[in-house]
Curated annotation (Swiss-Prot):
Pfam families: Ribosomal_L19
Any single GO CC term annotated in Swiss-Prot or TrEMBL for this entry: cytosolic large ribosomal subunit
Gene encoding the protein: rplS
Natural source organism: Methylobacterium radiotolerans (strain ATCC 27329 / DSM 1819 / JCM 2831 / NBRC 15690 / NCIMB 10815 / 0-1)
TM stretches of this protein: none
Protein name in UniProt: Large ribosomal subunit protein bL19
């Protein structure tokens, strides 16, 4: 094993952040710490993940949203201390790793179909029958 890879694994384990499993096409809510003067607050940034790149400590993802009719993209490092939490709002069904084509689309053509995970739903236990 490479020493650099080993150091990166140790650093990721030390950070011990809970990062949900998400892919391009998923709608994310990223809570970011924003410093304004002396105080810091948490700001929610919701949009579609259009790309993931890098690996290990250097991994990052790009989130795109439409704000007041203008497209806004923001790149977040996955292990950034400025990220408070990441939540997956909905899963998207896409067939590409990079969704840069969404930059040219507007309205209905920019929509992403929601993914239904049939197989994951079967893993959850069924509700117990009501005792009478």
């Amino acid at each position: 094993m490479n020493i650099i890879e080993q150091l990166e694994r140790e650093e990721v384990a030390r950070l011990a952040k809970t990062i949900p499993d998400f892919e391009p096409g998923d709608t994310l809510i990223v809570n970011v710490r924003v410093k304004e003067g002396e105080r810091t607050r948490v700001q929610a940034y919701e949009g579609v993940c259009i790309a993931r790149s890098g690996g290990g400590l250097n991994e990052s993802f790009t989130v795109r949203k439409i704000s007041y009719g203008e497209g806004v993209e923001r790149v977040f490092p996955v292990h950034s201390p400025m990220i408070d939490s990441i939540k997956v709002a909905r899963r998207g069904k896409v067939r590409r790793a990079k969704l840069y084509y969404l930059r040219d689309r507007r309205g209905k053509s920019a929509r992403i179909v929601e993914r239904t995970d049939r197989y994951k739903a079967k893993d959850t236990p069924a509700a117990a029958p009501a005792a009478e």
